[in-house]
Amino acid sequence: MTSQGSAHARFTRAIQRGNLFAAEMAARELRRLSLEDALAPIVLVSRWEAPRFDRAAVRWHGRLELETQLLTLPESQLALAALATLQGPAAHSGRCVLAEIGRRHRLPLAAALRLRP
């Protein structure tokens, strides 16, 4: 642990500050992020890097499907569509949809999406 705290604490601070580079560096130290934590950098990437966003969003969606028990096909499709909206004018709606899917499956996604629980 450095004087700045654990890698997870640095990751969280970097996300809160919108510092994608610092978040990625801390995430590398962690090696594996929870599904919830892995969503936060995608929200940041959605603002600036379109090609990178697509890859990250599809990868996260795959994890959602694999790690969430009882995810229905309509929920999976809705989650993918909600991820796609993060780069456009409906970004807030997309974040709300993802948070609701998370709530239904007991995943605390609201914080990663910068929404109040």
Predicted regions and their residues:
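Long, low-complexity, acidic Ser/Pro- and Gly-enriched intrinsically disordered regions
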Residues: M1-P117
